[in-house]
């Protein structure tokens, strides 16, 4: 029996507060140590379950075939765990930039899995959902669990973490960076010494992708050079988005008001418990 109600689900963005590349495996995947924290900037998926057996999505992302959309792929994978006639109509409000390092596609996929698990009344555990999610992307599980975490391995080994919930200014450079291209780069840092969690939390945080991205993407370098005059600034993920850290949202807003015309930017609050988790808790 499905839950018939229409629900608007958040799919929050994330920041990588640090990202270290500690090696590369024989299969080409990179060994990482990174700290994920959510922010209060979200895509939204409004989902109405039905018994049509079909998944419909409005609007689909321009230039992307429906079968390649992570929302659609997540729903179709989950359908194999439920009655064949279960379907859903999904409406996407896309607020997160694509290819920005904020995890938008992975978060959308995770929200789809969590939402349909509830609305189709499948009741898989989060551990099982994460096993499904990692098939769609290495960082999908962190969005499913919805807790700030240190991720290791290729990103699938998660340990809960409790970084300060700071305020951020997030800048969106006018360029797209391919994650695959960054990780395939010959001069990418790949030999950072692996650290204990205590060492990771108690040191200055860096992103090993940043030197390569700054050198090869002048628009990102320009943003970092401008923002670092105001506050500690670094790349999130492989970019292109850049974030600066502030003690209060008011401090971040002051810098936002000084943002030059050539730069899109916004402010956000760090969250150790995701908005998706908070909504799910009210539905049980």
Swiss-Prot record:
Pathway involvement of the protein, from the record: Isoprenoid biosynthesis; isopentenyl diphosphate biosynthesis via DXP pathway; isopentenyl diphosphate from 1-deoxy-D-xylulose 5-phosphate: step 3/6
Record's catalysed reaction(s): 4-CDP-2-C-methyl-D-erythritol + ATP = 4-CDP-2-C-methyl-D-erythritol 2-phosphate + ADP + H(+)
Molecular-function annotations in GO: 4-(cytidine 5'-diphospho)-2-C-methyl-D-erythritol kinase activity; ATP binding
UniProt keyword annotation of Transferase present: yes
EC number: 2.7.1.148
Keywords on record: ATP-binding, Isoprene biosynthesis, Kinase, Nucleotide-binding, Transferase
Catalytic machinery residues: 14, 139
InterPro entries: GHMP_kinase_C_dom (IPR013750), GHMP_kinase_C_sf (IPR036554), GHMP_kinase_N_dom (IPR006204), IspE (IPR004424), Ribosomal_Su5_D2-typ_SF (IPR020568), Ribsml_uS5_D2-typ_fold_subgr (IPR014721)
Binding positions (ATP): 97-107
Pfam families named in the record: GHMP_kinases_C, GHMP_kinases_N
Any GO BP: terpenoid biosynthetic process
Similarity comment: family membership: Belongs to the GHMP kinase family. IspE subfamily.
PANTHER family on file: 4-DIPHOSPHOCYTIDYL-2-C-METHYL-D-ERYTHRITOL KINASE, CHLOROPLASTIC
Function: Catalyzes the phosphorylation of the position 2 hydroxy group of 4-diphosphocytidyl-2C-methyl-D-erythritol.
NCBIfam families: ispE
Annotated protein name in UniProt: 4-diphosphocytidyl-2-C-methyl-D-erythritol kinase
UniProt source species: Psychromonas ingrahamii (strain DSM 17664 / CCUG 51855 / 37)
Gene that this sequence comes from: ispE
